[in-house]
Curated annotation (Swiss-Prot):
Required cofactor names: Zn(2+)
Predominant location category: cytoplasm
Full protein name: Ribonuclease P protein component 4
EC number per UniProt: 3.1.26.5
InterPro entries for this protein: RNP4 (IPR016432), Rpr2/Snm1/Rpp21 (IPR007175)
GO cellular component, one term: ribonuclease P complex
Subcellular localization: Cytoplasm
Family named by the database record: Belongs to the eukaryotic/archaeal RNase P protein component 4 family.
Assigned keywords, A-Z: Cytoplasm, Endonuclease, Hydrolase, Metal-binding, Nuclease, tRNA processing, Zinc
Protein source organism: Methanosarcina barkeri (strain Fusaro / DSM 804)
Cofactor: record remark: Binds 1 zinc ion per subunit.
Its job: Part of ribonuclease P, a protein complex that generates mature tRNA molecules by cleaving their 5'-ends.
Positions contributing to Zn(2+) binding: C66, C69, C92, C95
Length: 107
């Protein structure tokens, strides 16, 4: 197989992996109200896909997963969102850890 064919195959595999991660994320959002354990499993599958293909999880998905206990974070249910000193502070109610994400202030 030539270099170009390998590159095209790798790009195709990564595109499929990203599609699957987004689909699992949507399923986790919809299933959380009735089956929170199922949404935890979907998060685990998202992590497995990203590790298997050696690629990062998209930022929108990554910000909804606890970095310590890998829980699916839902604002108001198991996560608390606060604005503090130019950061969005996300507190996981399951493990008690906090994640901080910077945001730009409007001038």
């Amino acid at each position: 197989m030539s270099r170009i064919a390998r590159k095209q195959q790798k790009n195709l595999i990564q595109a499929i992996a990203i599609q699957r991660m987004w689909r699992l994320f949507e399923l986790a959002k919809s299933e959380y109200a009735e089956h929170p354990d199922r949404s935890e499993r979907y998060v685990q599958l998202i992590r497995n896909i990203s590790m298997r293909n050696r690629m990062s999880i998209p930022r929108e998905i990554k910000n909804r997963i606890c970095k310590h206990c890998y829980a699916f974070l839902v604002p108001g249910n198991n996560a608390r969102y606060r604005l503090k000193d130019g950061y969005i502070v996300v507190s996981c109610q399951r493990c008690g850890k906090e994640m901080r994400y910077p945001y730009k202030k409007l001038k």
